[in-house]
Amino acid sequence: MLDIIKAIEAEQVKTDITEFNVGDTVRVNVRIKEGNKERLQAFEGTVIKRQNGGIRETFTVRRVAYGTGVERTFPVNSPMLESIKVVRRGKVRRSKLYYLRNRVGKAAKVKEALNR
């Protein structure tokens, strides 16, 4: 039974995903369906979490919009994701950056990784 599930999941896993890590600033283009129209919406922010692996892998992006923190969680293998572009590489020493939620302004910045 487990082999059947793994075989089905292996077919659906995307292989053309951009390599990114926690702390990176990314721009995610998401397909939005409004009525019968479909358009792309960009969401740019810092990756604060990557969770699980395989087909169920998700990542959370945080940005501050008009003074309010906004976090969106995206499934990596979702067909609604058009593209993931790394804008800036970040240098962090944690796998989950939840501490950024309590910081404001320059304190919420992530250092840039010079060579990665």
Curated annotation (Swiss-Prot):
The keyword Transferase does not apply. Keywords: Ribonucleoprotein, Ribosomal protein. Signal peptide: none annotated. Pfam families: Ribosomal_L19 (PF01245). One of its GO terms (biological process) is translation. GO terms for cellular component: cytosolic large ribosomal subunit. The keyword GTP-binding does not apply. One of its GO terms (molecular function) is structural constituent of ribosome. This protein is located at the 30S-50S ribosomal subunit interface and may play a role in the structure and function of the aminoacyl-tRNA binding site. Belongs to the bacterial ribosomal protein bL19 family. This is Large ribosomal subunit protein bL19. It comes from Clostridium novyi (strain NT). The lineage of its organism: Bacteria, Bacillati, Bacillota, Clostridia, Eubacteriales. The gene is rplS.
